[in-house]
């Protein structure tokens, strides 16, 4: 039987010279493998007498435990060294700038809606909302739009069924509000509206903001003052002027188209007028005591003018290259 002390010393030196786990596994095989020196020593126990065998077996087991302990110690040291090398190679330079994280932004139409609401709130208007699917009564009849009016035709209006439509304007919000509240009333009604139309300046879905002011002594002069003040502040132009051209709308009398001064000329911006007595009758307001004005502006139109966009469809094509300009 080999000298057991020699095996321990040799194994410790052998393990210490190993630089990798693969080298260590090869060294392990020389001592603990099928043909390893300790395995051979255990096989040699059969040649000993019954009296010698217990002591020799115990001695071999002690040596085996010491060899395994030396093996584990070296394996742990190699793994620790490899981990330290890996960490050193992956050191993070904390002085480098962080990766930029893309952030979202509001759609330009949403930006315009927020600005419109903020400006009108600052002069005492409340913001009112209503359903986008309206009954025939609220979208047409209560607004003095007769049954034979072209606006009721299928080529202009999206019908949900015989009695309900996708609202063609936010005027129904005003009708609901006048039914529920008593004068004086001072509101704007922003929101989505729907019409059968689509080209560079029209979309089947677009946004409107309509205004309504009902009180005892309201006049066209109040209407002009409110609209001009709003447009001057919206476009940040104190020299901006507003003019009115006679027009016709079933729900206002008199009615007018509104133009604003723009690039040396005049640009149509919306419609307006004094609330028709028939509309007041439908909502239970005494037209002898109260007067009111109403106006409507296209939100996409305001957005196009404010940001210099010449095609309405760009707002709804979801091209991030375009939309990021406004974020």
UniProtKB/Swiss-Prot annotation:
It is found in: Cytoplasm. InterPro entries: aa-tRNA-synth_II, aa-tRNA-synth_II/BPL/LPL, Phe-tRNA-synth_IIc_asu, Phe-tRNA_ligase_II_N, Phe_tRNA_ligase_alpha1_bac, Phenylalanyl-tRNA_Synthase, tRNA-bd_arm. GO terms for molecular function: ATP binding; magnesium ion binding; phenylalanine-tRNA ligase activity; tRNA binding. The keyword Cytoplasm applies. Keywords: Aminoacyl-tRNA synthetase, ATP-binding, Cytoplasm, Ligase, Magnesium, Metal-binding, Nucleotide-binding, Protein biosynthesis. One of its GO terms (biological process) is phenylalanyl-tRNA aminoacylation. Mg(2+) binds at residue 253. It catalyses: tRNA(Phe) + L-phenylalanine + ATP = L-phenylalanyl-tRNA(Phe) + AMP + diphosphate + H(+). Its EC number is 6.1.1.20. One of its GO terms (cellular component) is cytoplasm. Its cofactor is Mg(2+). Binds 2 magnesium ions per tetramer. It holds the Pfam family tRNA-synt_2d. Belongs to the class-II aminoacyl-tRNA synthetase family. Phe-tRNA synthetase alpha subunit type 1 subfamily. Tetramer of two alpha and two beta subunits. NCBIfam families: pheS. This is Phenylalanine--tRNA ligase alpha subunit. The lineage of its organism: Bacteria, Pseudomonadati, Pseudomonadota, Betaproteobacteria, Nitrosomonadales. The gene is pheS.
């Amino acid at each position: 039987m080999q000298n057991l002390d020699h095996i321990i010393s040799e194994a410790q030196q052998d393990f210490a010279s190993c630089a990798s786990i693969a080298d260590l596994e090869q060294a392990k095989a020389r001592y603990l493998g099928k043909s390893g020196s300790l395995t051979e020593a255990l096989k040699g126990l059969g040649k000993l007498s019954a009296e010698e065998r217990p002591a020799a077996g115990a001695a071999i087991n002690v040596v085996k435990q010491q060899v395994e302990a030396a093996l584990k110690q070296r394996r742990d040291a190699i793994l620790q060294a490899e981990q330290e090398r890996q960490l050193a190679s992956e050191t993070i330079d904390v002085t480098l700038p962080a990766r930029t994280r893309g952030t979202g932004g509001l759609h330009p139409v949403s930006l315009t809606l927020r600005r419109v609401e903020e400006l009108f709130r600052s002069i005492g208007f409340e913001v009112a909302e209503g359903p986008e699917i309206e009954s025939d009564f609220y979208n047409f009849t209560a607004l003095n739009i007769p049954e034979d009016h072209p606006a009721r035709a299928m080529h202009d209006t999206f019908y949900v069924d015989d009695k309900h439509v996708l609202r063609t304007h936010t005027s129904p919000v005003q009708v609901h509000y006048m039914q529920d509240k008593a004068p004086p009333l001072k509101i704007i009604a922003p929101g989505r509206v729907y019409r059968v139309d689509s080209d560079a300046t029209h979309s089947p879905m677009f946004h409107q903001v309509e205004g309504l002011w009902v009180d005892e002594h309201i006049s066209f002069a109040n209407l002009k003052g409110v609209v001009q003040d709003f447009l001057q502040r919206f476009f940040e132009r104190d020299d901006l002027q507003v003019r009115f051209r006679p027009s016709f709308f079933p729900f206002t009398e008199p009615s007018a188209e509104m133009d604003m001064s723009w690039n040396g000329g005049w640009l149509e911006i919306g419609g307006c007028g004094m609330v028709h007595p028939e509309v007041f009758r439908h909502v239970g307001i005494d037209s002898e005591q109260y007067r009111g004005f109403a106006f409507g502006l296209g939100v996409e139109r305001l957005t196009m003018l404010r940001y210099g966009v010449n095609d309405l469809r760009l707002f709804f094509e979801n091209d991030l290259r375009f939309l990021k300009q406004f974020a």
